[in-house]
A protein has these predicted regions:
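Conserved N-terminal beta-strand and adjoining loop/helix that marks the start
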Residues: 2-22, 43
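Conserved Nudix-box catalytic region and its N-terminal flanking loop in Nudix hydrolases
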Residues: 21-60
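Short secondary-structure junctions
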Residues: 61-68
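Active-site-adjacent beta-strand/loop module that shapes the phosphate/pyrophosphate-binding cleft
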Residues: 65, 75-97, 107
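NUDIX/MutT-family hydrolases
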Residues: 90, 99-130
Length: 134
């Protein structure tokens, strides 16, 4: 009998609000899940708290500062390349501009327009939670 243990990668995502809109970021076409939209964020490094990881990732990806508020939800999603445990947080933008260092596009969406883009599968439970809370 063999047992396969799946490594679960802990990641965080920022649901960033500014002027009543939410930031959606489009993955680069040549990346995994290329062209899909997501909440910006990334892997939690060893000995790093989720909130510290989120601040670091937003600074790296968008050259922006955020204030982190409450957790929205946690989702475990099995992609063909990895299983991730995504925790998303409601955040507010603390800077006026963003720079797309790791994404090809970004949009500020009203919650009523949140389904106007094609989201990465792991982000769908967060979308549902946002819609239920709205």
């Amino acid at each position: 009998m063999s047992v396969n243990f799946v490594k679960v990668i802990p990641v965080v995502g920022a649901v960033i609000y500014k002027n009543g809109k939410i930031l959606a970021a489009q993955r680069k076409k040549d990346s995994r899940l290329g062209g899909l939209w997501e909440f910006p964020g990334g892997k939690i490094e060893p000995n790093e708290s989720p909130k510290d990881a989120l601040k670091r990732e937003i600074n790296e990806e968008l050259e922006a500062e955020i204030e982190i508020h409450e957790e929205i939800c946690t989702t475990v999603y099995e992609y063909d390349f990895a299983t991730i445990k995504l925790t998303t947080f409601r955040c507010t933008m603390q800077t006026d501009t963003i720079k797309l260092n790791e994404h090809q596009d970004a949009k500020w969406l009203n919650t009523s327009d949140i389904n106007s883009v094609t989201w990465a599968p792991a982000d769908i439970p967060t979308i549902r939670a946002i819609m239920e809370a709205d």
